[in-house]
Amino acid sequence: MAPKGSQRVVKKIVAENRKARFNYEIIDTYEAGIVLMGTEVKSLREGKANIAESYASDEDGEIWLINSYLPEYLQANRFNHEPRRRRKLLLSGREIGRLRSGINREGMTLIPLKIYFNDNGRAKLELALAKGKKLHDKRQSEKERDWNRQKGRILKDNR
C-alpha cells in the first residue's frame, strides 16, 4: 500500500475548450461545481459534452453556464434532459463577488475551460475570467508558438 502523501489526484477530463486559450487572455481561473440532473451526469460520464461555444453569465447574484451541450442520455426514458439548458454553477459568495467585479470591467468575460470529474466523482467546471484577444494579439501568440517550436527543433538537432 502506498503512503498517504504519494497518492495522485486523477481528473477525468470530459470536455475541454481548447480554443479558449487562443482566443482569450486568461486572467484568473476558478473551480465551480455544476448543478446537474441524473441523465446529464450519465451523459457526461460517456464523454460526449461540448463547451466550445458556451459562456457563463451573472444573473441575480448567481453564475449560470449558458449554451453548453450535453447530449441526451440514450438509455433514458421520457425524463431525459434538454441538451442546451442553462446550468447553475456552484461557487462561494466570495468567488461570485470577485467574478461579478471582474465581469463589470470592460472587455472581461467568463468562459469555461474544461469539465472534469474530480477524485470524489463530482462534476466540476474550470471557469476562467478572461479578456478577448484582438487579431494582432492572436497573430503574435501564433508567432511565439512557432518560434518556440523551431527553437526546440534546433536544440534537439544540436544535441
UniProtKB/Swiss-Prot annotation:
CDD domains: SmpB
Subcellular location as annotated: Cytoplasm
Pfam families noted in UniProt: SmpB (PF01668)
Region feature Disordered, mapped onto this chain: 136-159
GO molecular function: RNA binding
Any one GO biological process: trans-translation
Basic and acidic residues bias (residue ranges): 138-159
One cellular component term from this protein's GO annotations in UniProt: cytosol
Chief site of localization: cytoplasm
Keyword Translocase tagged: no
SUPFAM superfamilies, sorted: Small protein B (SmpB)
NCBIfam families xrefs: PRK05422.1, smpB
Protein name per UniProt: SsrA-binding protein
Biological source species: Rhizobium rhizogenes (strain K84 / ATCC BAA-868)
Gene expressing this chain: smpB
